[in-house]
Amino acid sequence: MVWAPVAVAVMHFGFGWRILDRERVRRRYREVRAGSDAPLIVCANHLTMLDSAVIASALGSPGWYLRHYSSLPWNMPEWRNFGSSRTRRVLVYLMKCVPVIRGGDRRAVARVLARIRHLASRGEVVLIFPEGGRSRSGRVDVGNAAHGVGRLVGSLPGCQVLCVYARGEGQTETTDVPARGERFRLRLSLIEPTSDARGVRRSLDLSRQIVGELGRLEREVLREAA
């Protein structure tokens, strides 16, 4: 956990990033974690390569994560960016990352999802971007729901989904890194998606419910910022 305060210090002092109403966000996350033992998947919109770090720092402090390590979300970075060497693989594991190759071999992706499912079933929190990649338009693409997240949620009985919408005040489009001095607005919504469909249709239905909720949160944030 040594990396956590270092990462927060870099974001806060190095880049000058701020989370607006941070204590409200953290209080809500603590309530969610204390309110149920059900599996929890955090699903978020995706605008930059550092969204996972921004969201993790918004949901809890390094000290709180040290006492509640299972609440620090696992995430799935692109293998080509982070998993290309043994040293990097060790580092990303310590940082609670399970690298995945986007658009790679289905069996390899299935193994990653199985690992993520195992972690979630044991009480670990997992962070996923249900649109499957960074938004090209800078907005949530409600029609671009990846069925993988729906399959994961559907395979975990009673699974809850914490939808997290995060956006920098100056963010108008997709970028690699948020701007220096950026201030982030976050909205959280806890849902439990259900579907009577079966197979792939069920997975897609669950995914669309999640992305649809992110779209609703986006509209709230944009109205507030206007």
Each PLM stretch: what is its role?
Residues 1-18, 84-96, 110, 178-181:
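Alpha-helical membrane-targeting segments
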Residues 9-39, 190:
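A short, well-structured juxtamembrane/interface segment
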Residues 10-20, 102-107, 138-140:
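Short, flexible loop segments at the rims of nucleotide/cofactor-binding pockets, characterized by
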Residues 19, 75, 97-99, 161, ...:
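Conserved beta-strand scaffold positions in the cores of enzyme catalytic domains, especially
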Residues 22-31, 56-63, 194:
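Short regulatory "switch" loops immediately downstream of catalytic or recognition motifs
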Residues 34-104:
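Catalytic core of membrane glycerolipid acyltransferases/transacylases, capturing the structured
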Residues 38, 106-226:
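Non-catalytic C-terminal accessory region of glycerolipid acyltransferases
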